């Protein structure tokens, strides 16, 4: 998904900016240095980069970046931490997003529209718009042509895993590599919508996003959620027993972190933060969850952690104005990669820092009980 706030109607955004309150206050004795050390920028090339995810051994990181001269949209890249080399994984055509490395395999998962015969036209239209000098707020369009693919990084062989009208993306493998969880908006295209639903689809297609699960070969696709509002950004817990994701409220004003069993049962709300809380990812220890939230200001996203049961108030991790989000720990839990605009550039870039796991546990133990909003 995009490394910024998901697109919302203007009226909703205005209401959200009014709804956010400064009631949350980070502990006075905590700061970014408590959790992060030796922060450094990983990506420099391109207009923007984000969403970095690791191979099981930590050697590779897959991410998305806008860096091709002939395509203004995200493409997928693989960074090798041993050699320092970065290579393009996707095909260079269309839009791509949300890559993930399959454990025990050379396969890389991502979503793409390269099969769309209109892809080159959309690319040229966007290139022409940017060349005109005009500007617009960055947004994500939830392209209904987006489908999930798996590509072998050695042979280049690709497999199309979904083929449904509607945005299929935000996919990740289970720890054993046998299952894939993803978000889909196919429901809006598979049935006849009411007049009100059709209007919603035209304004905010993300409203129809739901969580699905399937086998790694694309078979046995099953819907797990059926709640009005955008459900997306799912990942498996380290033990593979549960799924973490974020759920937007029906009116799109807020989002919170949830977890459930892999069959869709036992759905639990883990945050009640009264803001946009999204992009959750579980620490390898299984003891707490990283996520991003704009609790401190409409356009100021920071990284937070919350205990895995959601019994405590979240603890703030980053303290830098702008965008800090999409946090993902390395497989050994000793480092954290996230997307940030702290360099004051045009778009987000990837950063990495050493992670203080012990201090995180201490801070969560000291956090007050969760308050309902």
Describe the role of every protein-language-model region.
Residues 2-13:
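Bacterial N-terminal signal peptides that target proteins for export
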Residues 46-47, 64-75, 91-96, 111-148, ...:
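A flexible loop/linker signature enriched in serine peptidases of the S9 family
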Residues 56-57, 103-104, 175-176, 238-239, ...:
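Residue-level detector of Asp-centered blade-edge/turn motifs that repeat once per structural unit
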């Amino acid at each position: 998904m995009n490394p910024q706030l998901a697109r919302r109607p203007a009226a909703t955004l205005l209401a959200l900016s009014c709804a956010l309150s400064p009631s949350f206050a980070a502990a006075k004795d905590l700061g970014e240095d408590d959790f992060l050390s030796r922060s450094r920028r990983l990506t420099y090339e391109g207009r923007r980069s984000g969403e970095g995810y690791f191979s099981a051994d930590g050697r590779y990181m897959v991410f998305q970046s806008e860096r091709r001269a002939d395509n203004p949209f995200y493409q997928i890249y693989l960074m090798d931490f041993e050699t320092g080399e970065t290579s393009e994984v996707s095909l260079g055509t269309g839009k791509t997003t949300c890559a993930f490395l399959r454990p025990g395999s050379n396969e890389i998962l991502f979503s793409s529209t390269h099969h769309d015969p209109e892809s080159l036209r959309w690319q040229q239209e966007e290139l022409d718009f940017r060349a005109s000098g005009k500007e617009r707020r960055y947004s994500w369009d939830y392209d209904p042509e987006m489908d999930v693919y798996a590509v072998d990084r050695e042979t280049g062989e690709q497999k199309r895993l979904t083929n449904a009208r509607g945005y299929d993306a935000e996919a990740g493998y289970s720890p054993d590599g046998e299952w894939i969880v993803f978000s889909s908006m196919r429901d809006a295209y598979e049935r006849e919508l009411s007049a009100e639903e059709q209007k919603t689809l035209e304004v905010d297609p993300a409203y129809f996003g739901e969580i699905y699960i399937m086998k790694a070969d694309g078979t046995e696709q099953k819907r797990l959620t059926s709640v009005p509002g955008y459900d997306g950004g799912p990942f498996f817990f380290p033990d593979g027993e549960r799924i973490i994701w974020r759920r937007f409220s029906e009116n799109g004003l807020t989002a919170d972190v949830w977890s459930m069993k892999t069959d869709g049962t036992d759905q639990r709300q883990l945050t009640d933060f009264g803001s946009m809380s999204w992009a959750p990812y579980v620490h390898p220890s299984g003891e707490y969850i990283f996520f991003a939230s704009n609790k401190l200001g409409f356009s100021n996203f920071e990284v937070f952690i919350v205990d895995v049961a959601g019994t405590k108030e979240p603890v703030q991790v980053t303290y830098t104005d702008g965008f800090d989000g999409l946090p993902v720990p390395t497989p050994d839990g000793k480092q954290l990669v996230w997307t940030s605009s702290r360099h004051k550039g045009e778009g987000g870039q990837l950063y990495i820092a050493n992670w203080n796991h012990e201090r995180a546990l201490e801070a969560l133990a000291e956090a007050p009980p969760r308050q309902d909003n």
